[in-house]
Amino acid sequence: MRDAQEGRTGRIRVVARVRPLIREDVELPEATAHARSGSREECVAVDERRASILLRKPFYDAREFVLDSVLGRDATQSETYEVVARGVVDAVLQGYNGTIRAYGQTGTGKTHTIYGPLAYWRRGSQPQLELSGIITRAAMQIFAYAE
């Protein structure tokens, strides 16, 4: 596949999107113990400029991962689409193959990123473009191209 935005051929790009903390995260015993210890360090530190993620856990060595792109906790669905999918869909429209894959642990936001919030898909719900995931946005881009 040729990435129209970066001019690369046949390359797999790795992008991480770090989701915001949810209620369950804060209620975990480890989170409570971490807060009691007085440590204010985040266990997942995001550096979007360097496209890196630093993982910290008490009593373990920190691990840094440098990727092609990193989207922080405040990344919108639109920003995510622009970074992750627009170039792939552009290449597909030019006749190349393209795949977008969401991978990760349960509860990390894959479904939200790909489809949008589950409430968005309930029967009778009003569509809200700003909440749309990658699939809806890709379909819209393809249909706009076809017109």
Q: What do the PLM-derived regions correspond to, one by one?
A:
Residues 1-55, 60:
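Long, basic/Gly/Ser/Thr-rich N-terminal segments
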Residues 40, 49-147:
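P-loop NTPase motor catalytic core
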